[in-house]
Amino acid sequence: MSRQSLTKAHAKITELSWEPTFATPATRFGTDYTFEKAPKKDPLKQIMRSYFPMEEEKDNRVYGAMDGAIRGNMFRQVQQRWLEWQKLFLSIIPFPEISAARAMPMAIDAVPNPEIHNGLAVQMIDEVRHSTIQMNLKKLYMNNYIDPAGFDMTEKAFANNYAGTIGRQFGEGFITGDAITAANIYLTVVAETAFTNTLFVAMPDEAAANGDYLLPTVFHSVQSDESRHISNGYSILLMALADERNRPLLERDLRYAWWNNHCVVDAAIGTFIEYGTKDRRKDRESYAEMWRRWIYDDYYRSYLIPLEKYGLTIPHDLVEEAWKRIVDKGYVHEVARFFATGWPVNYWRIDAMTDKDFEWFEHKYPGWYSKYGKWWEEYNRLAYPGRNKPIAFEEVGYQYPHRCWTCMVPALIREDMVVEKVDDQWRTYCSETCYWTDAVAFRGEYQGRPTPNMGRLTGFREWETLHHGKDLADIVSDLGYVRDDGKTLVGQPHLDLDDPKKLWTLDDVRGNTFQSPNVLLNEMSDAEREAHVAAYRAGKTVPA
């Protein structure tokens, strides 16, 4: 189709739009933004006639690669360490995709621009396609991998797991609160424009290095759609910028969206890339190096900073703090240690680090061994049942962390933890920005302006609170993380399946009572709480 005929077809579509003049339409998805002065253009002029043949070709390539992987015995070559982490990743990622599809009607309803409505409808179809091919990838892994346990329960496990629910919070951010905040700034302007770079470009590169060429095929197919989504987001952003009343809301939402994306995506993808790989070539990029290239240079410097010419205040301080957390404060390494601590309630197995891993981490992050090496040696020592408890219940110099109320990633950079009483409850936050998000941004008023559409961060947000005072064996059983024999745990702190005596069972973990740090915090006196928080921030090992 020529560009001229495409433009004519697009113009015809906009002629079919209808705006009633005799009544005010009912608002289905509310927003506090205003668009009376907004320009109404769609720079890409997206239409279905050119869209479907392109997507059909992409799907053919994806399913052809899946067939080729089976015929080519890919699963004899792929690293187990890598595929185990895919049990968690592929249980989470289809949910944000389908949430993004659900977000498109919110954006269509909130944005009075017939031109861009068609592009948003196309994006909705994209997101459904993405979720579908990711679910099919997960099914193929389950059917062909040596240990399907975990892959076969991901939809259930994702919703009740201490790690999966972090991803659920992330995806629900696309469809809750103010329609523009959720469906445009949080989803499109930040998540899709920035963090899909590490998610769908850097991570597939790591997959290929571990013998998995299916994930790169699927996720490059996904990423190739993102340019259109970025265009949709930028168009709506420019519409919002046309009205000065929207500027404070945009600046609020950029701070919230950037920080929550960093907290969740960097925690997950950084861990998958750095602790899920067996490729320890010294010239291989660390996650910090990937982040500097794909997020700092490609997004922050080329996309965010130019927005200053429109009068927006860009969250430079939060970008620099995110970089500092990754490079100087060990954010990804803390997340990996937290996931490994929780192995009994995982539905994936976490491989121990070896001397080769230690050497690579020390090369990329000088000082890594002095902070994390001893703990991973303890993880290796406590890998098998019979002589010890799971590592979370052994004295190894590690205190189980408090959960952040906002992003739901624990307060792992302990010196930065914030403790405040909000809505008559003592809450813990991983950072000042997460506290601000809960106490200031998600409220009915912002800087003296009513913001009734923002909503609140409510519900049972702390996984630990749901299981406070329960025996570990009962928690695992209630979650359903037990293999077909009715006793062996799905999660294991090693990859050795050959010897049944090395596999942990419900009996091996029974007798360990789980305590929620946040429940205990609310039960403390003021003096006890102050002492506990001070010790936590200082990194001292004290009872939760």
Residue locations for each model-derived region?
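Carboxylate/His-rich catalytic cores and anion/metal-binding grooves
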Residues: 124-152
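Short metal-coordination and nucleic-acid-contact micro-motifs, chiefly zinc-binding Cys/His arrays
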Residues: 397-403, 423-426
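Terminal targeting/low-complexity segments that flank the catalytic cores of oxidoreductases
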Residues: 1-114, 144-178, 182, 245-246, ...
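Short cysteine-rich clusters marking metal-coordination/redox-active sites
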Residues: 404-407, 430
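Long, repeat-rich segments with strong aromatic
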Residues: 197, 201-276
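Zinc-coordinating Cys/His ligand positions in small cysteine/histidine-rich zinc-finger domains
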Residues: 412, 430-431
